[in-house]
Curated annotation (Swiss-Prot):
Keywords, ordered alphabetically: Disulfide bond, Glycoprotein, Host endosome, Host Golgi apparatus, Host membrane, Host nucleus, Membrane, Transmembrane, Transmembrane helix, Viral envelope protein, Virion
Organism from which the protein derives: Human cytomegalovirus (strain AD169) (HHV-5)
Regions that span the bilayer: 14-34, 80-100, 127-147, 152-172, 201-221, 240-260, 265-285, 299-319
Localization, UniProt: Virion membrane; Host Golgi apparatus, Host trans-Golgi network; Host endosome membrane; Host nucleus inner membrane
Domain of life from the UniProt record: Viruses
Subunit architecture: Interacts (via N-terminus) with gN (via N-terminus). The gM-gN heterodimer forms the gCII complex. Interacts with host RAB11FIP4.
Function: Envelope glycoprotein important for virion assembly and egress. Plays a role in the correct incorporation of gH-gL into virion membrane. Directs the glycoprotein N (gN) to the host trans-Golgi network.
Bias-annotated ranges (Basic and acidic residues): 348-359
Classification via HAMAP family: HSV_GM
Gene name as annotated: gM
Protein name per its UniProtKB record: Envelope glycoprotein M
Amino acid sequence: MAPSHVDKVNTRTWSASIVFMVLTFVNVSVHLVLSNFPHLGYPCVYYHVVDFERLNMSAYNVMHLHTPMLFLDSVQLVCYAVFMQLVFLAVTIYYLVCWIKISMRKDKGMSLNQSTRDISYMGDSLTAFLFILSMDTFQLFTLTMSFRLPSMIAFMAAVHFFCLTIFNVSMVTQYRSYKRSLFFFSRLHPKLKGTVQFRTLIVNLVEVALGFNTTVVAMALCYGFGNNFFVRTGHMVLAVFVVYAIISIIYFLLIEAVFFQYVKVQFGYHLGAFFGLCGLIYPIVQYDTFLSNEYRTGISWSFGMLFFIWAMFTTCRAVRYFRGRGSGSVKYQALATASGEEVAVLSHHDSLESRRLREEEDDDDDEDFEDA
């Protein structure tokens, strides 16, 4: 079947979005490379934010001065930036593969607006725009770290985390219910069936980045708060654990309540959350200033509680995943229900359309008779 006008418009818009995505990726890559050289317009290197040698857990914040707080050290920030860039590269390659398979294929499919259906399921223009926002906000986040502005670091970390979250949700749900998602999957072009596994890998990779960004945004928020309010550094270190626990629990619950229906294999956030916990441990173990005071007991208990929460939700996800694999009939039953409902709706729509056409023909016959 020849592509319709809707398919042509949607394909061109989607292609333009992918072109902008590639340009944004190149821009962010060049920015990260150049930001390692302070004499090229950047005041400082982005990966050296906090001087842990000057950190004092018992000291209060001094207004108009930079107060060191718990944050990622230089090695962690470089690894974080490189990993995020690899995630961006993988997502960009995924979109390019989808674009080649949809735009360059000779068999356009037998369904009306087949390309539009495929683009909507694999990642439409809005999802591509959200990914571009995620890359842009990450670039601004590293730029604020280069200027060492605590308030802006906290703000851009939160904005980047929000954009990455919305992009992940759009990749998982495609803005539709579970039954509608199953129906669109059943109408997917046969040549894209294998790419769905690539899409599952991309979803989990983005969730790994999201899990580690939970640690980053918790540190950044407390880092900004601690440099703008008269609080102790030790209290802000403990606040990092509280913020991390709240955000991670919300995401764990969303995965178990909603997202697991769309993508069965979802261990990416759990893996990223584990790496985030390790990212919290490293600077605390590396620098004795964290443990040589009265906050040692509170920090130890906080670590224990966070690892317990992580282990509990990870075990729950593993049990539900393997139990779901054992009962394969549920998936096909839901697919049949979704298809039946969709066919019933389409049949009702066709009957109404046929009735409307018959009425118009009768009216035309009456007018011809009157003219005669």
